[in-house]
Amino acid sequence: MAKETFSIEFAGRTLTVETGQVAKQANGAVVVRYGDTTVLTAATMGKMATGDFFPLQVNYEEKMYAAGKFPGGFNKREARPSTDATLTARLIDRPIRPMFAEGFRNEVQVINTVLSYDENASGRVAAMFGSSLALAISDIPFDGPIAGVEVAYIDGKYVINPTVAEKESSSLELSVAGNINAINMVESGAKELSEEVMLGALLAGHNAVKELIEFQNEIVAKVGKEKAEVELLHVDEDLKAEVIAAYNSDLQKAVQVEEKLAREAATKAVKEAIISVYSAKYENDENLSIILRDLAEILEGMEHAEVRRLITEDKIRPDGRKIDEIRPLDAEIDFTPRSITHGTGLFTRGQTQALSTLTLAPMNEAQIIDGLNDEYKKRFMHHYNFPQYSVGETGRYGAPGRREIGHGALGERALEQVLPSLEEFPYAIRLVAEVLESNGSSSQASICAGTLALMAGGVPIKAPVAGIAMGLISDGTNYTVLTDIQGLEDHFGDMDFKVAGTREGITALQMDIKISGITPEILAEALAQAKTARFQILDVIEATIAQPREELAPSAPKIDTIMIPVDKIKVVIGKGGEQIDKIIAETGVKIDIDDEGLCSIFSSDQSAIDRAKEIIAELVREAKVGEVYEAKVVRIESFGAFVNLFGKQDAMVHISEMAWARTAKVEDVMKLGDVVKVKIMKIDDKGRVDASMRALVEKPEGYVEPERKPRERRDNKDRRNGNGFDRRNNDRNNHNNHNNNSGNHSFELRERKSHVDHEFPELSTKKPE
């Protein structure tokens, strides 16, 4: 195949697709260039798998060379995918998966490799486009194409594929994907936006998606391959009719058992009895394994059909609830002692239960994220764990999988919208959700438990957040939207639409579907039902704890902050860390200073924090013109006196400024050690301060200012002491993570120009010129 190139302008950037040049042994491969982002996508198909699921694998490979960076770590090589790469792979998988035929069981692998990265041209948008197109032009049976975009909401307007700067000013971060007819994937974080604004964003995003799909269709028409004939998994129709006729009523009764474990036991017993009958019947048949495989599919289909029939026809759910009814709710705080943990929340919804535990720490414990974007510190972490005992099973127990990472990220987006700013609450925050029981919607239970833990721990969140999962049963013509879906409804339903938010608005959305798409009408109905349910859950949360506690747990570290001018960082640190060492030794605190001048002080002793803050405030204090001080005389010269205003800040009082009458000698007015009242008259561009005593005394009536020769300061030798030195230590080594371990200072030294500008040395004996 010869190289083909296709281009359009999309959302302010050029989108270029190249085919036929690279990865030609894959079933389908494309190079997508969006802005300066380049993604290679290759799609391949393997043999038919033996399992009862579609083995689709989507990878998003972040190569550090794409951003001109070296990988971290000892080996200097990319290892396991980052959290962001894992989430992006899930984001692509979810809209693609429903576009394969029922019964398709061949292995399909889609690999997206980021070759160059432009932060203002989304790699995930390019990779989603490339994944769909690689499948669409290949011979792999794929009922696409699909596409996805990002949507921001800025000053009342929707922006498609926003730049980094636009994202920073946006109140919405939305990824939406779909086919030409409908939306089939949503992922969003939002700053308490209304249902109407969110629905508008979804529709704006889908309109943009249609443009990308039309572009793909043009490419497929020119370079697409004929689709391969692939065997789909079909069951024996005669066997299916026989089993339904004989056993459907038994399975219907089992499905209608309301309690989860009892229902599972009942359906399992019915299925095992049927399998036993047919195992004996076809014991000597060489196709026994195929018969039993078909039988398992038939029984699953019978259960699937009965659950959907109950909901759509009888308007009864398997557990007996109404269509819009929430399961029984319970909320509790302080599940573990506050003397040990910093805050806990236990949230139960029916047979789904999550325990969330809060941990607070200084910002030096924040997670450092180093990916294709610039390195940054991640202050808030929400981790989700799903042990197998939560569903009464045994299984793998180890590092979190893609599902756990995804559910944790959803909770993180929902809760981070209401967190206080770093200036308001200078802590790194970690929430860990342990799912203790699960019968559907455990990710939303973790959000509710997280809200309880934050409030119990004294984190001043703006408002409590609750989450609910909405479901859908649709036959293509009629549909039913379900509130608070349980596991069975999730498994056999068509949609899992998670909505989290406060009373003011939505903070997070996530939608996965098993059908080709969802109409705007269904989305609007689901959002409206979710709002009603969310308020009911918030009632329970607020009845448990109405407001965040005013005090942190006794076990939580105490932190206070003070903003210091960037040019004063050197003063607080001192030469070689001498000054900050002195503060630490005196108070016993730990101190962290960032490049912006945010100085965090932490200790278990509040009085120690207060003392350290007082010392630092004094060190960075600056004199201002017009201020009045009680100042101590620290040096006397023939032309005037030097007085100490505070800390290491001195001022010079010229002899002519000591009184309105002529002063012959400084000693006639003051002596060393005297305390005099002075007013700041001038501060020059080098920070030298002139003060006056006479300015605080009323000018005598009839006073005439004598003529004086203008006084000029010399750049190289100041009149005061013959040099340009500052008494204050001006080392500007930036200090981070400084602790009071004996002699062990952990701080980062950045190259700064060394200043030795000591002004007014107290012990100088050099006479002025």
From Swiss-Prot:
One of its GO terms (cellular component) is cytosol. Keywords: Cytoplasm, Magnesium, Metal-binding, Nucleotidyltransferase, RNA-binding, Transferase. Mg(2+) binds at D490, D496. The keyword Aminoacyl-tRNA synthetase does not apply. SUPFAM superfamilies: Eukaryotic type KH-domain (KH-domain type I), Nucleic acid-binding proteins, Polynucleotide phosphorylase/guanosine pentaphosphate synthase (PNPase/GPSI), domain 3, Ribonuclease PH domain 2-like, Ribosomal protein S5 domain 2-like. Residues 557-616 form the KH domain. It comes from the Bacteria. Belongs to the polyribonucleotide nucleotidyltransferase family. Involved in mRNA degradation. Catalyzes the phosphorolysis of single-stranded polyribonucleotides processively in the 3'- to 5'-direction. PANTHER family: POLYRIBONUCLEOTIDE NUCLEOTIDYLTRANSFERASE, POLYRIBONUCLEOTIDE NUCLEOTIDYLTRANSFERASE 1, MITOCHONDRIAL. This is Polyribonucleotide nucleotidyltransferase. It comes from Lactococcus lactis subsp. cremoris (strain SK11). The gene is pnp.
